[in-house]
Amino acid sequence: MNKIVLCLLVFCVAHSAAYDLLKAPSYFEDFLHKFNKHYSSESEKLRRFQIFQHNLEEIIIKNQNDTTAQYEINKFSDLSKDETISKYTGLALPLQTQNFCEVVVLNRPPDKGPLEFDWRRLNKVTSVKNQGICGACWAFATLASLESQFAIKHNQLINLSEQQLIDCDYVDAGCNGGLLHTAYEAVMQMGGVQAENDYPYEGSDGNCRVDVAKFVVKVKKCYRYIAVFEEKLKDLLRIVGPIPVAIDASDIVNYRRGIMRYCSNYGFNHAVLLVGYGVENNVPYWILKNTWGEDWGEQGYFRVQQNINACGIRNELLASAEIY
């Protein structure tokens, strides 16, 4: 077969724009099998199909309108947007807040840096994790940045314990949500954080079992950033390291690949890690690490267009920390 024809066939099969709303029942049965979905009753199955059909319609519209990204049926496709956000994100204002972190206003014009930069290429980013049904994105994003700080300083990748923060951070609310800077403050108050192997992830709230003798990372100081110019995040990323950021995750749920040019910003509900940036077909983009597993997006990552405040990425909830 002609190689060009073969490539076109592969592209057509792979591209989610090929979805047909009339085939929703067939897609749904495939979805049930692929993701091993089971429901308590036929009425619940019907309800889930109706949600699935609504999500499929949204996926088709997105694939028609967003020419630089692709969207697909995935493990969240039988959940409403509100369900996905409530179960799989977790950025929320704690009942009590503190202010240990120094506030830095990024109001100077950006420097002339490289067009592309990616901390993954320098082997300073740990593997993608999966928070599961626990609203602890705040813990994953903050500790992912500390993991990178440790790798930058000691040239060694180590996985830290999100479960320690979920169980022992009494400012944030465990699987019910938290913030980025308050998580850093909690690590400072506790004195450090253990490795994941010593305090494994359980995906639910538990009793604090912290062992100070097993701390592997200690935080010296934390910072909150107010970015006046989105472009300035490039300088911050290169100088500081991977940065946890707050976003609105509503539009990334059914993301598959490419650069998202349309991502709403109706309120922050999720935290992810900014690890790099680049340009593809003259479209500048940010690279972000998510916590929904490697079977989501671009092996757990996603890209959004720069300088349009995609998903609300430019906000006052940016944070980072300096380790000993």
UniProtKB/Swiss-Prot annotation:
SMART domains: Inhibitor_I29, Pept_C1
Glycosylated sites: N159
Protease recorded as keyword: yes
Modification(s) after translation: Synthesized as an inactive proenzyme and activated by proteolytic removal of the inhibitory propeptide.
Signal peptide region: 1-18
GO BP: proteolysis
Database matches in CDD domains: Peptidase_C1A (cd02248)
Catalytic activity field: Endopeptidase of broad specificity, hydrolyzing substrates of both cathepsin L and cathepsin B
Keyword annotations of the record: Disulfide bond, Glycoprotein, Hydrolase, Protease, Signal, Thiol protease, Zymogen
EC numbers, comma separated: 3.4.22.50
Propeptide residues per the UniProt entry: 19-113
GO molecular function: cysteine-type peptidase activity
S-S bonds: C134-C175, C168-C208, C263-C311
EC top class named in words: hydrolase
Name of this chain's protein: Viral cathepsin
Organism: Hyphantria cunea nuclear polyhedrosis virus (HcNPV)
Organism phylogeny: Viruses, Viruses incertae sedis, Naldaviricetes, Lefavirales, Baculoviridae
Encoding gene (name): VCATH
